[in-house]
């Protein structure tokens, strides 16, 4: 049987479904974004999110969280976009893949005045292609140069650069925190962050990372 405990940190830190926590410089909740958008998420002026990218990927996320999947991927994506609209960030980054990039680009180009598509890869392997689709209504100082500087970087490095350089005094939010790269790097920079995550086992990894200061 597969082990999806992610190190067992949920038990160590008492992270449970529905729980809301202060951790480092951030505030997070273990919840399903298709069911609720916590009020505190609306404080995010910058959003970065790496959401499930297909029906199979979405099913895997719910299976690992021990939650029955009730929605089709198209409905999940619609709800994600609605959450971003409610937050109304000044800058939004959505990590995308071949299976969902067209939908993401359509959303970003509709909701924001300017769009940039940054080529990237994940797990430190250039064969694992992805794209960071960014939207802004008012370009931050040095925006175009920054986008060029991170082009082709590993997505982990791009997240680090976003946390340190893009409106660094503002709150950054992540609707699908996973194991918490956004929270980890925001905390490293002393930056406030907010986030939600479906799976308490995955979210609890962030607690361990912040405690140890290591990924």
Ranges and model annotations:
Residues 1-215:
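Class I S-adenosyl-L-methionine-dependent methyltransferase catalytic core
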């Amino acid at each position: 049987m597969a082990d999806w405990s992610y190190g067992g940190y949920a038990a160590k830190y008492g992270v449970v479904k529905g729980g809301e926590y202060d951790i480092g410089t951030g505030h997070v909740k273990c919840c399903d974004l298709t069911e609720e958008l916590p009020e505190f998420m609306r404080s995010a002026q910058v959003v970065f999110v790496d959401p499930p990218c297909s029906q199979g990927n979405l099913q895997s996320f719910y299976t690992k969280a021990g939650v029955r999947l009730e929605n089709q991927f198209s409905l999940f994506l619609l709800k994600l976009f609605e959450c971003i609209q409610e937050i109304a960030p000044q800058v939004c980054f959505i990590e995308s893949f071949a299976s969902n990039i067209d939908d993401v680009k359509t959303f970003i180009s509709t909701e924001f005045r300017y769009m940039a598509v940054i080529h990237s890869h994940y797990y430190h392997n250039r064969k694992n292609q992805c794209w960071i689709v960014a939207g802004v209504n008012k370009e931050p100082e040095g925006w175009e140069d920054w986008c060029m500087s991170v082009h082709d970087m590993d997505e982990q490095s791009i997240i680090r650069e976003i946390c340190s350089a893009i409106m660094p005094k503002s709150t950054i939010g992540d609707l699908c925190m996973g194991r918490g790269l956004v929270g980890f790097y925001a905390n490293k920079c002393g930056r406030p962050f907010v986030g939600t995550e479906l799976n308490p086992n995955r979210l609890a990894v962030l607690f361990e990372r912040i405690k140890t200061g290591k990924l």
